[in-house]
């Protein structure tokens, strides 16, 4: 009889332990989803504040929508950061679709920011030192630049010519565009991303690590 009650008590204890685990799981995931939604909305709003870096190619613009994505990387992980980036891109597609140009450019922007975030997280996420931040920023900038050269060559330039009536190869010259505009633009963009996030992360670090 004693062993029976002991077994029942143990089973009840295990049941409440399982309930506690599931409660914590749902509370944690609800909190996580709320942060991702908020960061995605902020990232979308930051898309409206963009500026050109190269006067001869004023259609190549940089914005700071990556900053909330990097905050998600700090608070959670790489997958959550990509989730913020994806939701931001969907909001852009649904609420501020600029036609063929946006339809062509948005996937490229997603890839560009995604590879930059991955490069930064590869060195910096597990061990957040200044050295690893610099290494991650350099890797992210290189990956960003290479990805944009390749995607412009095989994807964007042909599609802009076909659907947006803008043949970059004819007006500027393909290789001149790639190496005199795309490469320096993305190198500068990676540098701007790295410096901007470092500047906001320093004062916010004590807050972000507690979230």
Swiss-Prot record:
Gene Ontology CC entries for this record: plasma membrane
Main subcellular location of this protein, as a coarse class: membrane
Classification via Gene3D superfamilies: 1.10.1760.20
Membrane spanning residue stretches: 34-54, 66-86, 104-124, 134-154, 180-200
Pfam families: ECF_trnsprt
Subcellular location as annotated: Cell membrane
Keywords: Cell membrane, Membrane, Transmembrane, Transmembrane helix, Transport
InterPro entries: ECF_trnsprt_substrate-spec, RibU
Superkingdom to which the source organism belongs: Bacteria
Keyword Lipoprotein assigned: no
Membrane topology designation: Multi-pass membrane protein
Keyword Cell membrane annotated: yes
Single Gene Ontology BP annotation: riboflavin transport
GO molecular function: riboflavin transmembrane transporter activity
Subunit note: Forms a stable energy-coupling factor (ECF) transporter complex composed of 2 membrane-embedded substrate-binding proteins (S component), 2 ATP-binding proteins (A component) and 2 transmembrane proteins (T component) upon coexpression of the 4 components in E.coli.
Family note: Belongs to the prokaryotic riboflavin transporter (P-RFT) (TC 2.A.87) family.
Described purpose of this protein according to its UniProt entry: Substrate-binding (S) component of an energy-coupling factor (ECF) ABC-transporter complex. Mediates riboflavin uptake, may also transport FMN and roseoflavin. Probably a riboflavin-binding protein that interacts with the energy-coupling factor (ECF) ABC-transporter complex. Unlike classic ABC transporters this ECF transporter provides the energy necessary to transport a number of different substrates. The substrates themselves are bound by transmembrane, not extracytoplasmic soluble proteins. Expression of the complex plus RibU in E.coli allows riboflavin uptake.
Protein name as it appears in the record: Riboflavin transporter RibU
